[in-house]
């Protein structure tokens, strides 16, 4: 999946065109499309970096949503934020958790696949994935 970003030009294209270029073409166009790190890992690294700096504004929320888009589950982001809290600070974790709760629902993405239709189907099956199956155990 190729990352394409136009927010820099949209927000700052006339006012700061060089910065917009660096944002859209270099940061996102080149760095985010580098194949040496997968997008899920890159997203986690970005969230951790912003959290460590105490940046808990709309840019962090964007990157939390981006992490979700690239396969980070609710349980994974909770584990990441909790781990980083011990190194970057407890108040920062609280701030990030408040944003993360706006992006993920509890247990969202905890199945081994991320497709919405498949998740919905898995929860409605005769024997839903992840649910106990007492009827089968008694047979």
Region spans (language model):
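Acidic, glycine/proline-rich low-complexity segments that act as flexible tails and inter-domain linkers
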Residues: 1-41, 60-61, 69, 93-139
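Helix N-cap / loop-to-helix initiation motif
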Residues: 38, 56, 71-78
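Short, structured motif recognition centered on aromatic/hydrophobic residues
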Residues: 41-51, 60, 64, 77-81
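Substrate/cofactor-recognition hotspot
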Residues: 43, 83-91
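Short alpha-helix boundary/capping elements
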Residues: 49-56, 88-89
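Short polybasic/polar patches that bind polyanions
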Residues: 33, 51, 68, 86
């Amino acid at each position: 999946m190729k990352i394409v970003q136009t927010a820099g030009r949209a927000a700052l294209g006339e006012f700061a065109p060089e910065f917009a270029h660096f944002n859209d073409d270099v940061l996102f166009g080149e760095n985010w499309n580098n194949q040496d790190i997968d997008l899920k890992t890159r997203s986690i690294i970005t969230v951790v970096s912003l959290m460590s700096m105490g940046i808990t504004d709309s840019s962090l929320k964007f990157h939390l949503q981006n992490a979700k888009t690239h396969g980070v589950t609710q349980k994974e982001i909770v584990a990441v934020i909790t781990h980083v809290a011990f190194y970057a600070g407890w108040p920062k974790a609280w701030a990030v958790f408040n944003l993360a709760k706006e992006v993920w629902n509890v247990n969202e993405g905890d199945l081994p696949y991320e497709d919405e239709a498949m998740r919905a189907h898995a929860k409605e099956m005769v024997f839903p994935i992840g649910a106990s199956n007492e009827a089968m155990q008694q047979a």
